[in-house]
């Protein structure tokens, strides 16, 4: 955001700095270096001003990938290793990340029905990649049943919680502009998380 900085956030009374970084470990070297320097610079500023740094990492699709979209929706057929390798990179001490906000390392379709060993292993490897830093999971707008399973696997592997949006509140907000029904939806369906 123009005219904002870690220093300004701290002086304004912020409790933490949250940054979203779109990353793809198999991207061009120049892009990777730019993204890494950007995150490192923010981490150094957070350390300087003694404010926690929460990094949200999302793997982006290349232009010619199947299911490419300009909207942020869960990337179908994402590769677990891309998610895991991205986390491994930013778990290095030089980035000074205090907590991660991470997407599931698998497609939400892999969270329906019986869970495969590959899916279980992907969550284990995601947890290892954090280098023992706290992490929370995001919903990527996946369905509620898949998100419950995602939370189950994340918690079994050491996740500290979740920071999720659409999966939890979207159904309630479909009642807008009827604020009474929005409120009711938030107090019933959304609370179960």
State what each model feature region is.
Residues 1-17, 23-40, 44, 48-52, ...:
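Alpha/beta enzyme core
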Residues 53-54, 135:
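Hydrophobic beta-strand scaffold residues
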């Amino acid at each position: 955001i123009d005219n904002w900085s870690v220093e300004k956030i701290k002086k304004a009374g912020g409790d933490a700095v949250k940054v979203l970084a779109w990353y793809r470990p198999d991207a061009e070297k120049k892009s990777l270096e730019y993204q890494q320097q950007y995150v490192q610079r923010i981490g150094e500023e957070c350390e300087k001003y003694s404010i926690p740094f929460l990094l949200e990492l999302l793997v982006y699709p290349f232009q010619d990938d199947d299911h490419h979209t300009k909207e942020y929706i869960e990337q179908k057929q994402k590769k677990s290793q891309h998610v895991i390798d991205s986390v491994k990179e930013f778990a290095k001490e030089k980035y000074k990340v205090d907590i991660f906000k991470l997407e599931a390392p698998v497609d939400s379709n892999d969270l329906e029905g019986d869970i495969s060993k590959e899916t279980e292993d992907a969550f284990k490897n995601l947890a290892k990649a954090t280098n023992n830093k706290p992490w929370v999971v995001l919903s990527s707008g996946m369905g509620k049943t898949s998100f419950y399973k995602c939370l189950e696997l994340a918690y079994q592997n050491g996740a500290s919680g979740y920071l999720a949006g659409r999966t939890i509140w979207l159904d309630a907000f479909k009642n807008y502009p009827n604020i009474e029904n929005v409120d009711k939806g938030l107090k019933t369906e959304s609370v179960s998380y």
